[in-house]
A protein has these predicted regions:
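Terminal accessory/targeting
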Residues: 2-11, 21-169
């Protein structure tokens, strides 16, 4: 990432929440401490996937190590963000995604993370490709801008929302 982007990441997370899985989490935090802990460099914040929603999927994501990762971050004064919103079953329909988004935005506390999975084209190898295209279309729409305004939510770059010394609950 750093070679291609020519900068350290603003945040660290993992596809399908692997950053908090036992076995991966320990390697990740070791690398983070080695690369950013002692040097005084700005520390990338960690996404703790503690899903602030009801349902089986939300409970499963949270159970996959969110508490352990958050405990490590707190013990090491590492910047991190929890809760996470945006978990759903990729059900069809643009109006369904819009309703989900309205609910997530309405319950979003300060310094929460909202995950999304957009793509601007279908990929036949991706089982959630249709949902990705629907998300992309919605996120580009005036309806999304209106939903943000109605909920009083402002999008920003992660490093601007969470100062390196700040910890979200």
């Amino acid at each position: 990432f750093e070679v291609q982007w020519r900068a350290a990441p603003d945040h660290v997370d993992g596809h399908q929440h692997v950053q908090q899985f036992a076995g991966i989490r320990e390697v990740l935090v070791s690398v983070l401490q080695r690369r950013y802990g002692a040097s005084g460099a700005a520390r990338p914040w960690l996404r703790v996937s503690r899903v602030a929603q009801v349902g089986v999927k939300a409970r499963a994501i949270s159970a996959w190590g969110a508490q352990a990762l958050q405990d490590w971050a707190r013990a090491n004064s590492w910047p991190h963000v929890a809760p996470l919103l945006g978990a759903y079953n990729f059900d069809p329909g643009a109006s369904t995604y819009a309703r989900h988004m309205a609910q997530w935005l309405a319950q979003m506390p300060a310094q929460a993370t909202l995950m999304c999975h957009p793509a601007n084209a279908l990929d036949a190898r991706d089982p959630i490709a249709p949902a990705r295209v629907r998300e992309h279309a919605y996120l580009r729409s005036d309806a999304f801008a209106d939903a943000l305004a109605q909920a009083g939510v402002q999008l920003c770059r992660g490093r601007d929302a969470l100062a390196p010394s700040t910890e979200a609950p």
